[in-house]
Amino acid sequence: MTHPNELPLSPLSALQFYATAPYPCSYLDGRIARSQVATPSHLINSDVYTDLVKAGFRRSGVFTYRPYCDGCRACVPVRVPVDQFEPNRTQRRVWKKHGELIATVAPLHYDEEHYALYMRYQSARHAGGGMDRDSRDQYEQFLLQSRINSRLVEFREPLRDQADAPGILRMISMIDILGDGLSSVYTFFEPGLPNTSFGTYNIYWQIEQARSLKLPYVYLGYWIRESPKMAYKANFRPLEGLIDGAWCVLDPTSVDLPPVDLAIHGKRPPLKP
């Protein structure tokens, strides 16, 4: 059990932090990962979770964690400062392209249409990774269980024909509402349409939603320089990262991080016990 001294004493002092056993890294092939888990989950309300996110934690269902890998700091928590965000030409084009999508914000709930879209997305984007075989229970545990202020956002095309009512579903996004921003939990979308850039549109939408709520940040989870799947996050500028316990503006092309190869030497992570 560890109590990271970079975390404030209250209200996080009631939590305990445990390191998991090593497991295969889901981001970098051939790597071994570990996580640090915050428990008990019933004490992690929205205020506590806001502080945890500031310290680099994320959640999967009611499981709250952050990377705790031996000698590797490849996973960088990142966020976009809303008032400073400047969309590039590609992002503006995507925003205009999908401007007709209708977003509906709702409490977390199960819907068979959502689950079917999730399975199509996993089969197309992550075939063989395990999530393409998720049962309904696994889907609900992953995305629909939360003890904090969470929302499900539907993105549909405008209703053009009664046969398509209530409009063709294109994307689902789960977000958490924090004290200082929105946290992007997970997004999945229709995978069979070419050149849609739904993911880019979704982040842009979250930034504009945070702006309308007068929230200063959108937290995007972890960015990994060596992972092509994470590259899109670096396109949102300015991008801030949590480096050595402090949030600072990142230059994704030259951010000073230890090489991931340090992991093979068994060095301890840069976290104090």
From Swiss-Prot:
Function: Functions in the N-end rule pathway of protein degradation where it conjugates Leu from its aminoacyl-tRNA to the N-termini of proteins containing an N-terminal aspartate or glutamate.
GO molecular function: arginyl-tRNA--protein transferase activity; leucyl-tRNA--protein transferase activity
Localization per record: Cytoplasm
EC number(s) given by UniProt: 2.3.2.29
Domain of life: Bacteria
Biological process annotations from GO: ubiquitin-dependent protein catabolic process via the N-end rule pathway
Pfam families for the chain: ATE_C, ATE_N
Family note: Belongs to the R-transferase family. Bpt subfamily.
Subcellular location, principal: cytoplasm
Keyword NAD: no
Organism: Paraburkholderia phytofirmans (strain DSM 17436 / LMG 22146 / PsJN)
NCBIfam families xrefs: PRK01305.1-1 (NF002341), PRK01305.1-3 (NF002342), PRK01305.2-3 (NF002346)
Keywords: Acyltransferase, Cytoplasm, Transferase
Organism lineage string: Bacteria, Pseudomonadati, Pseudomonadota, Betaproteobacteria, Burkholderiales
InterPro entries assigned: Acyl_CoA_acyltransferase (IPR016181), Asp_Glu_LeuTrfase (IPR017138), N-end_Aminoacyl_Trfase (IPR030700), N-end_Aminoacyl_Trfase_C (IPR007472), N-end_Aminoacyl_Trfase_N (IPR007471)
Enzyme class name: transferase
Protein known as: Aspartate/glutamate leucyltransferase
